[in-house]
Amino acid sequence: MDKMNPDIVIPVKGLPLGESSFRFEIGEPFFQAFENGQIKDADCSIRVRVVRHQTLLDIVCEIVGFVVVECDRCLEDLTLKVDTEPHLTVGFGTVDVDDAGVEDDVLVIDHTESELNLNQFVYDYICLSLPLVKVHPEGKCNPEMLRYITDNEGTETSAEGETSRPFEGLKELLKNKDN
């Protein structure tokens, strides 16, 4: 699969019992398909290992690569490493999870399905592998933006251009209470 064809699809029909392996490469076109995405660009390799049982598929996706996101501090591009290995269990038709011996969540698909699209699964796990706060290492942020943040720290400007102090009114209430 080339990075211009962003679908991660596993053929389910005709998949032999036992282990099968698939490789995919994803880049910017893959992430553009998702609205409101935080990932601007990427270069990731995905190795999908599928173990087919009689009524289940055990899927492991080894996702390794880099993604480009916006720095939360300076808004410049920030490249982050991705290295995650999510697991997914897929059942056919109506699978009784207790009988199958599976404790994790099971995605159930109709037994007539011929393929399984893993796009959303891969996208979600790449996003979950990213840190909550995405910032450059100390000293690597855009110095001009940091200067702007430092100069304007602690002040808010109202619509009229005046600097607002949200706790000023509370201080007045405390003064009046003491009197």
Residue ranges and their predicted role:
Residues 1-70:
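A positional/architectural concept
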Residues 28-30, 54-56, 75, 96, ...:
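Residues that cap or initiate secondary-structure elements
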